[in-house]
């Protein structure tokens, strides 16, 4: 049965120390956790990987006034300071002063990066660029302006075009600005995220987005296969999977070992083995797990010296 693709939702509960736990604190309270991130891709733990407060939300996509359809008066979310929470389950952009937020599944994220500000100052030269696939909720919050008609435009030209909205998230304060919160900070503390202002905040968020996006990489692949794969091409699809670059996913979902492959007996420098059997490809290897702060030493011996 085809799974329904998650879409953006309106969040009514703001993440706090009562319902989420920062990643560094999670590692301290879970001694059984050994760095295998695959255990974090479930609903048992809501873990905070990154984010920040006092952010300025903008949009690069031409949009009309942002509002919810069930509100009588349109309200621009950019007028209010926003908080960003990058969780293992989703992304939440919380609109302070409005009492709600935007919950974004990772399957809706098309692109994320850091963008240099043309008018930046020292310690505040970057902002987060987040490209999202449009859905009903994003259409309510960011109503796209109708494109101008063109004689070359047609239904075929837009058949495979993904409708998207580009958001910018800019820190309000630089790394070097002296700022005191009105309330005691319990989530984005120095112990958990460092200074987490200005450019440091942008870099921290991009790293957190990369980790969490890779956590949900398999979910996106499964949805794409169920939606687009032709049953008659199942065998060809299985062959293609063997040639797919998995990126960081193998490291996050598997044990911390070196991944390698090859033929077994090549330690004797045999030219026949090298040129005929392996043909210059990967040769003998083994999977080894190294623990932290341990010195490593090794030697490769030929058969004549054994």
Curated annotation (Swiss-Prot):
Keywords annotated in UniProt: Cytoplasm, Nucleus
Primary subcellular site in the record, as a coarse category: cytoplasm
Gene Ontology CC terms, in alphabetical order: cytoplasm; cytosol; nucleus; pICln-Sm protein complex; spliceosomal complex
Entries under InterPro entries matching the protein: ICln/Lot5/Saf5
Induction: By cold.
The keyword Nucleus belongs to this UniProt entry's keyword annotation: yes
GO biological process: mRNA cis splicing, via spliceosome; spliceosomal snRNP assembly
Record's subcellular location: Cytoplasm; Nucleus
Entry's family note: Belongs to the LOT5 family.
Additional detail: Present with 5930 molecules/cell in log phase SD medium.
Protein name as annotated: Protein LOT5
């Amino acid at each position: 049965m085809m799974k329904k693709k998650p879409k953006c939702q309106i969040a009514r509960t703001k993440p706090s120390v009562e319902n989420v736990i920062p990643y560094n604190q999670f590692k301290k309270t879970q001694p059984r956790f050994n760095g295998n991130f695959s255990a974090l891709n479930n609903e048992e733990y809501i873990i905070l990987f990154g984010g920040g407060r006092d952010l300025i939300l903008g949009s690069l996509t031409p949009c009309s006034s942002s509002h919810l359809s069930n509100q009588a008066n349109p309200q621009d979310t950019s007028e209010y300071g926003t908080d960003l929470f990058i969780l293992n389950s989703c992304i939440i952009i919380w609109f302070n002063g409005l009492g709600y937020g935007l919950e974004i599944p990772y399957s809706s994220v098309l692109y994320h990066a850091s963008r240099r500000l043309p008018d930046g100052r020292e310690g505040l030269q970057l902002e987060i660029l987040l490209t999202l696939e449009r859905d009903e909720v994003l259409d309510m919050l960011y109503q796209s302006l109708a494109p101008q008609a063109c004689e070359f435009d047609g239904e075929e030209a837009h058949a495979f075009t993904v409708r998207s909205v580009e958001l910018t998230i800019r820190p309000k304060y630089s790394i070097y600005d002296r700022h005191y919160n009105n309330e005691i900070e319990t989530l984005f503390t120095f112990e958990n995220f460092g200074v987490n202002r200005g450019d440091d905040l942008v870099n921290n968020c991009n790293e957190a987005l990369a980790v969490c996006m890779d956590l949900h990489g398999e979910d996106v692949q499964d949805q794409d296969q169920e939606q687009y794969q032709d049953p008659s091409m199942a065998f060809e699809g299985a062959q293609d999977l063997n040639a797919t670059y998995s990126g960081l996913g193998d490291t996050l979902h598997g044990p911390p070992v070196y991944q390698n492959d090859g033929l077994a007996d090549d330690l004797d420098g045999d030219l026949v083995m090298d040129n005929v059997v392996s043909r210059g490809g990967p040769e003998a290897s083994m999977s080894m797990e190294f623990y932290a702060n341990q010195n490593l030493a090794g030697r490769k011996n030929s058969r004549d010296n054994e």
